[in-house]
Amino acid sequence: MKTFMASPATIDRKWYVVDAEGKTLGRLASEVAKVLRGKNKAIFTPHIDTGDYVIVVNADKVKVTGKKLDQKIYYHHSDYIGGMKETTLREMMNKHPERVIEYAVKGMLPKGPLGRQMYTKLFVYAGPDHKHAAQKPETLEF
């Protein structure tokens, strides 16, 4: 018996919608990353993108534990000398709540071209509405 290896032509992708309201950030992100990678499928192949599309709604209502709202800091650089910028989780949730989930999930995906391809199948929205009704997404519960 040979080991099954999926090929891009044999992959059947589904669309899932996840409601982030009341869910803990890290636990939600790890489950979403598993679906994006395809680890929940029997045909998972490490070097092929076998994952499904995931839509996350209500990103502004995700919860975090402890003092992370004030102590978790996101860093970025302006490419100028002394241009290190920092933003707390509270500021990020007020300005761009969808980026919080995007950064958390992106950090849990493989680094490299395959991980970047998987990341393109993630869609995050701050409110309860999304523009992917034509894909008929199924609700995914964790």
Curated annotation (Swiss-Prot):
<dbReference type="InterPro" id="IPR036899">
    <property type="entry name" value="Ribosomal_uL13_sf"/>
</dbReference>
<dbReference type="InterPro" id="IPR005822">
    <property type="entry name" value="Ribosomal_uL13"/>
</dbReference>
<dbReference type="GO" id="GO:0006412">
    <property type="term" value="P:translation"/>
</dbReference>
<dbReference type="InterPro" id="IPR023563">
    <property type="entry name" value="Ribosomal_uL13_CS"/>
</dbReference>
<keyword id="KW-0689">Ribosomal protein</keyword>
<dbReference type="GO" id="GO:0003729">
    <property type="term" value="F:mRNA binding"/>
</dbReference>
<dbReference type="InterPro" id="IPR005823">
    <property type="entry name" value="Ribosomal_uL13_bac-type"/>
</dbReference>
<protein>
    <recommendedName>
        <fullName>Large ribosomal subunit protein uL13</fullName>
    </recommendedName>
</protein>
<comment type="similarity">
    <text>Belongs to the universal ribosomal protein uL13 family.</text>
</comment>
<dbReference type="GO" id="GO:0017148">
    <property type="term" value="P:negative regulation of translation"/>
</dbReference>
<comment type="subunit">
    <text>Part of the 50S ribosomal subunit.</text>
</comment>
<dbReference type="GO" id="GO:0022625">
    <property type="term" value="C:cytosolic large ribosomal subunit"/>
</dbReference>
<comment type="function">
    <text>This protein is one of the early assembly proteins of the 50S ribosomal subunit, although it is not seen to bind rRNA by itself. It is important during the early stages of 50S assembly.</text>
</comment>
<keyword id="KW-0687">Ribonucleoprotein</keyword>
<dbReference type="GO" id="GO:0003735">
    <property type="term" value="F:structural constituent of ribosome"/>
</dbReference>
<dbReference type="Pfam" id="PF00572">
    <property type="entry name" value="Ribosomal_L13"/>
</dbReference>
